[in-house]
Amino acid sequence: MKRLLVLIFGISFLVELNAQKAYSALPKYTAAQVREDALVLKKVLEANHPSLYWYTPKQQLDSAFEQMLNSIADSLNEIEYRNKIAPWVALIKCGHTTAQYSKQFIKQLPKYRYPRFPLQLKFWEDSAVVLSNGYLKDSFVQRGTIVYSINNKPVSYFRDSLFKQIATDGYAYNHQYQTLSSSFPDGFKQVFGVDSTYLIGYMNQAGKQDTISLGNFVPAPRDTNTNRPRPTERKTTLSKRQLRLLAIRSLSIDTITHSAYIRLTTFSKGNLKSFFRRSFKKIQKENIQHLILDLRENGGGRITNSIALTKYLKHSPFKIADSVVAISRKFKHGQYIQSSWLYWLAMNLGASKAADGLIHFKRFEQHYYQPKNRFAFKGNTYLVQGGYTFSAASMVVGALKGQKNIQVVGEESGGGQYGNSAMHIPYITLPNTKLRVRLPLYRMVIDQNRPKGRGIEPDIKIPPSSYAIRMGFDPKMAAIQALIKSKNN
């Protein structure tokens, strides 16, 4: 047993050492090259971004840029450079303006992923709770365990440091919490690197603070022993395409409670218009009285798909926004903007210059969409949202919130309720590092009478809890089921 432990430790050490060598072997860019890239980024954003100073004054953004530029004293690899650029980009407070790795590095990223921090953590407010532990047999730090420190630093230190890397719509910080909760080990490694061990401060089962030392997580190698019997594989009648579609959208019906559940994870793909038509036809046929629409994983997508869904649920005509405005159709520094000619063409065909000198997408400003008559749903509707509910998904919630039969359940949305910058979103590609930054071309004020700067607040707020995580149940769905039961009685 002792020899086995030594062998396992030795393998882990070698894997970690090789990963660190690979990390340090990443191509370096000179200080002059990365400064040039930063200056290119700034001038492209200043010339084309419609909402650059919507939340952050120019003086503050310029000052932060100078500090970032002055901090570049030596050559940097792509990870180090993104760690410099991303906080400045996030300071714009536009959730659609984000710094991303180059296409080439994205292809190589899997080989840099391990070893990494062993705990997946769920963050909210001042809490951090274990979702999973890479060491499955560890009986101390299990799912639902509260973590209060890492290497003698409070978890708030790591949370706040990584928050600086995550862009939001204004001050809709729940998006940062949700994003961090789904990617903490990767974010930790990206910004802080890896240690050989981590001293974890946690709350033990007796309710007292305790510590434990954990190593990095490295997945076990695949078992190549062909003589060992393989586990029985479950046979499925679903094709790969059907499984892909189920991951995007699904409908389930409970005829006992007269309720239907629609899970929708995107508005980008999945033949959604035909799915909506089939689903609401079936809902009507089964005489469903309660509809749960789960948008917690939905980061948005095509506005035309979100409009199609809203038509089945909205009781009155609606329009998309009070204003949808771009600075210009003439892309300055277009050589750095992905397919700028294609976006130029789209803006010339779909938008027009108004008296204020700006480019307006008048279809969304002026046209009122009519609700569906056929298969429209008039029963009790529960919209489930959270920090990932963003862009076109939060537009659906915003359009329906306040309607008599609608209740919004969950947490604050990640998408801004007042407006956002979106529509056409090409990439800026920096000339030396090839780092990419998303560039939304239109500023959309959805409703000028709504509060500016936050996401959509739920009608029924149900935050996460360590108890629910530990016990493995969904408190939001449990609350909705209780509401349905009370209305059926």
Which residues make up each language-model segment?
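Flexible, low-complexity junctional segments that flank or bridge functional domains
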Residues: 20-291, 295-299, 303-325, 417, ...
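Assembly/interface hotspot detector across virion components, adhesins/toxins, and nucleic-acid enzymes
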Residues: 3, 121, 367-369
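Solvent-exposed, well-ordered amphipathic alpha-helical segments
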Residues: 2, 12-15, 286, 290-292, ...
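Conserved acidic, small-residue-rich alpha-beta core segments centered on
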Residues: 303-469
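Bacterial Sec-dependent N-terminal signal peptides
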Residues: 1-24, 41
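Juxtamembrane/interface motifs at transmembrane-helix termini
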Residues: 7, 103, 169, 177-178, ...
